[in-house]
Amino acid sequence: MSESVHTNTSLWSKGMKAVIVAQFLSAFGDNALLFATLALLKAQFYPEWSQPILQMVFVGAYILLAPFVGQVADSFAKGRVMMFANGLKLLGAASICFGINPFLGYTLVGVGAAAYSPAKYGILGELTTGSKLVKANGLMEASAIAAILLGSVAGGVLADWHVLVALAACALAYGGAVVANIYIPKLAARPGQSWNLINMTRSFLNACTSLWCNGETRFSLVGTSLFWGAGVTLRFLLVLWVPVALGITDNATPTYLNAMVAIGIVVGAGAAAKLVTLETVSRCMPAGILIGVVVPIFSLQHELLPAYALLMLIGVLGGFFVVPLNALLQERGKKSVGAGNAIAVQNLGENSAMLLMLGIYSLAVMVGIPVVPIGIGFGALFALAITALWIWQRRH
């Protein structure tokens, strides 16, 4: 890995390109692996309510490791942290390929993802600064969503052909991400921090307190947590919605529908990069409310074309909503608790929201509530939550 103390802050520097490529391949593997593993669960006749449990063990790793991964990201060169994390993902995907319990293998991928996230976002503030940070976030989100688009579809299509081929493709993507990480320049870290677990937990709780007590960062944390909690729940809702509403039982169709959301988020992220700055973040809030309005309308559809269009609209609104909130947290968090710790706190909030929403969704499926009413109620509650957040933000 090349040694560098001073960074080229160009939006298209060599280091930024390496980060974007690594992010694409890593996110491609994450999304392909989800649908490949869901296909494996179906092939092995696991109950439907166990599907969200797969994601819950993944986000559980984020929550348990939250006090530690931020310091890891800040104490070592972030490119090396990303490389190690992608290596863990590779190991997890390979273990599922070789017949180890899919929940255990997916948990290992979750450990890698937990270590990866603070580094991948924290490095943006080191590779670029100021007005370019929102644009860099737009590039990162566009890369991630392009990977969601292609990875989700690849996972479903390959799983319809052969589940083992789909799992092997995921491992290959993670291997490519490890190689791309080699080309990220070695940036300055903050070594010398205590590695006592009690002290690290206390430090993390202090970072949580600092960010949650600040009005701007609390606003960002709540908004992104609600968005990603809702987003991951929607992915699983689609898996059950497709056969009920459309009468289609393959693995590929839910991935095509998820791809529509991904395309929309790319468009929305690009629009946010052009139209929203750190000083005008509140412009994104109406888009968040509209997500909750569109989801119930989507849930009532019975034809593919309207479903595609509405999911793309949900994606556009989502991209426009979440990118400015991410940038706000990174900018304010970098100055107060360090970029890595800020993202770790964000991950705790987002994954706690995911765990809660997935748990409620899994329980609803387990007790037999039909998927269409689940979708309607889910959208309505999301719209109310974002409306309440906007009202709170305007008053404070």
From Swiss-Prot:
Stated membrane topology is: Multi-pass membrane protein
Instruction: Enumerate the CDD domains for this protein.
Output: MFS_MefA_like (cd06173)
Q: Name one GO cellular component term.
A: plasma membrane
Q: Where in the cell is it found?
A: Cell inner membrane
Residue ranges in the Cytoplasmic topological domain are: 39-52, 112-144, 188-225, 277-279, 325-342, 387-396
Q: Per UniProt, what is one GO molecular function of this protein? A: lysophospholipid:sodium symporter activity
Q: What is this protein called?
A: Lysophospholipid transporter LplT
The record lists the lineage as: Bacteria, Pseudomonadati, Pseudomonadota, Gammaproteobacteria, Enterobacterales
Gene giving rise to this polypeptide: lplT
